[in-house]
Amino acid sequence: MHARLLGLSALLQAAEQSARLYTVAYYFTTGRLLWGWLALAVLLPGFLVQALSYLWFRADGHPGHCSLMMLHLLQLGVWKRHWDAALTSLQKELEAPHRGWLQLQEADLSALRLLEALLQTGPHLLLQTYVFLASDFTDIVPGVSTLFSWSSLSWALVSYTRFMGFMKPGHLAMPWAALFCQQLWRMGMLGTRVLSLVLFYKAYHFWVFVVAGAHWLVMTFWLVAQQSDIIDSTCHWRLFNLLVGAVYILCYLSFWDSPSRNRMVTFYMVMLLENIILLLLATDFLQGASWTSLQTIAGVLSGFLIGSVSLVIYYSLLHPKSTDIWQGCLRKSCGIAGGDKTERRDSPRATDLAGKRTESSGSCQGASYEPTILGKPPTPEQVPPEAGLGTQVAVEDSFLSHHHWLWVKLALKTGNVSKINAAFGDNSPAYCPPAWGLSQQDYLQRKALSAQQELPSSSRDPSTLENSSAFEGVPKAEADPLETSSYVSFASDQQDEAPTQNPAATQGEGTPKEGADAVSGTQGKGTGGQQRGGEGQQSSTLYFSATAEVATSSQQEGSPATLQTAHSGRRLGKSSPAQPASPHPVGLAPFPDTMADISPILGTGPCRGFCPSAGFPGRTLSISELEEPLEPKRELSHHAAVGVWVSLPQLRTAHEPCLTSTPKSESIQTDCSCREQMKQEPSFFI
């Protein structure tokens, strides 16, 4: 179906552009220079679309700089995207990376085609409609060009909506009947709007620009009041509202993740009233009713009726959530329930059709191809191991500024990371995205090499893992605590220290079923202690855990601690679990088996209330303080670790600690006092 839809899109685009060029030549050959120059001027916004397409090609790492530039200068950049997507879709057996590339190619193509249709086809449609009406329907060339432009613009809207829907997790196949109803809906609404504006221009000329400008301002203020969160920057958000307000002069597009029934009804009611007023003024119906005026008004408004009927049929019968939508409308009309609660996420129809998907996108784990990884930046495993912390941060920033990340937000109609995380989930199958800045061939080669050279985490050299982390990344982690995830450990440099492994180097993606937090043990003055790593999960708090036991005999001198960092990268909704850092050393006391042993709140001693520890001053140690020598009396191979996990989105800053208890468990009787328990086993949340 991908190939057929791409073929239909290419056929409509070829017909529309051929008719447009023939119309320009027709005007110049017949001596109608004004219309010829106006039709030629409409082609100028196409250079903006070609420039954007070229930049996106370069952002994707496409080779061939000179040839690519020449194609875009000749206005063939969108056609090249058609060709690439067609070649990819015609492959009989698409592997996961190819399916991922096909979906990204289709998303880029649909967005560029919609932009080209709005900038070129829309003005050309208005111009040719006016020329065709001014000639009293006798000039065939403008009429044919009007028909193709009308169909092409409507299909661009349908194609954009369809491909954006494919980027959502759990998407369902859209039948041809649904596409046909959407095409009728778009053509009916668009035709009525264009005819109303053109007829009003024939009667009042440039006053139509006042009407269009007033409609633009009203729609822009309405968009501002709706508070769409797709764009984060304030300046870009205002520009986005202005551009969408201009689009709303002709057609409607939804940019909100909430049910849009009320918004759509409001928009089309306003459009209907405007069209009726424009038609009444254009046909002089108020001055005296005539049969011709009635025919004109009825003919124009019949398109609105056809579009409305097609819209109702699509959302009541052919939409994946049509059952919920229809039942919600009935409940609201009967007064049983109101509001926008009709489009629930777990609809019966969507559940029944979930197993009947006929189209899907690539997967890196199995036969289920859902584009859930599009909402997540590349993991540190996709970055070369020799790259430092700065390289990984640059990769994450490039992903968040990449245009494919914009498609994710437009598909889900939100820029809220929490909502994107909830939509894509943690365990849904996904295809592995290409590394940004690499071409498809380079990505496939790198993926094959990485699969061959991948070794188990237990066989990795700890010294290599420690050297791969850069010390200069610490200020970055401190300056940006809300968007980074860092693991910092301090280990003493003893000669006979047991080999340890950097926990962050073997991080994987956690699941909701894994453990609560990453726990790291710390050894103070004494002879026993150990370090254990737990599994991590998504959390909006920072968990710090330490264990210390008082000893009586130890004469070893401690050396200055060394700092080890491993940046795990920004994860959208997933924390990376910390694996066990070292084997259990012989002779060290075991870590407490239950949470009650390490919590001053869950203890059963005489002082079970939370008592602030004297060793916790409520501030973060500086680098100079961390580099000071440890206490003189320490056992060999003693080390302390601090595990810090920050997941997006962060709900509170690092300057606002949240003190709470550890997860509840059965209390174990202890006979130590509150002060001794706080000194030996401090555990708290930051």
UniProtKB/Swiss-Prot annotation:
It is a multi-pass membrane protein. Keywords: Cell membrane, Membrane, Transmembrane, Transmembrane helix. Its main location: membrane. Residues 339-387, 448-468, 490-592 are annotated as: Disordered. Residues 450-468, 490-509, 550-567 have a biased composition (Polar residues). Residues 523-536 have a biased composition (Gly residues). It comes from the Eukaryota. PANTHER family: XK-RELATED PROTEIN, XK-RELATED PROTEIN 5. This is XK-related protein 5. It comes from Homo sapiens (Human). The lineage of its organism: Eukaryota, Metazoa, Chordata, Craniata, Vertebrata.
